[in-house]
C-alpha cells in the first residue's frame, strides 16, 4: 500500500469516528471543493476548509461516512467511493434518514492533501469526470 493510500485511510478512520476537525493531513493552501449538493463552492486554506466543514456539518445531525472502495489513481490522486448517512438538522423537523452514494477525490503532494473534491450527491459524476465507469 502506498503512502498516499495510507494517508487517505487515516483520514477516513477519523471521519468514521465523527472527527472532522483534524487537519494535519491538509496542505496549508488546500482547496476544499463541494462539487454538488446543497453547499457548492470552493474554500481555500485550512481555515477556509474548516469554515466549509462547519457550514456543511451544521445541516446534518448524526452524519456518518462509510467507505465502499478506495482507488489509487495516477498523479498523486486517490478516489474514495463512500456512503453518507445522516439526518437533516434544518428547522428542527426530523426529515428522516438521508443516504447518499458519494465520492471524494484527494490530490496529494509531498504527504499533504492539496485539493479535496467532494461529490456528495453523485459518485457517477465523479467517475465520469475521471473517465471511469460506474
What residue spans do the PLM features occupy?
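C-terminal and inter-domain tail/linker signature
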Residues: 1-134
Amino acid at each position: 500500500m502506498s503512502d498516499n493510500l495510507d494517508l487517505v485511510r487515516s483520514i477516513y478512520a477519523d471521519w468514521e469516528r465523527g472527527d472532522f476537525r483534524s487537519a494535519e493531513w491538509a496542505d496549508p493552501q488546500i482547496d476544499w471543493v463541494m462539487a454538488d449538493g446543497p453547499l457548492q463552492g470552493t474554500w481555500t486554506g485550512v481555515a477556509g476548509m474548516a469554515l466549509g466543514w462547519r457550514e456543511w456539518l451544521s445541516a446534518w445531525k448524526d452524519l456518518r461516512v462509510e467507505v465502499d472502495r478506495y482507488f489509487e489513481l495516477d498523479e498523486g490522486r486517490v478516489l474514495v467511493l463512500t456512503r453518507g448517512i445522516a439526518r437533516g438538522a434544518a428547522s428542527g423537523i426530523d426529515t428522516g434518514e438521508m443516504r447518499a452514494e458519494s465520492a471524494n477525490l484527494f490530490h496529494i503532494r509531498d504527504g499533504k492533501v492539496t485539493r479535496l473534491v467532494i461529490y456528495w450527491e453523485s459518485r457517477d459524476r465523479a467517475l465520469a469526470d475521471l473517465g471511469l465507469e460506474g
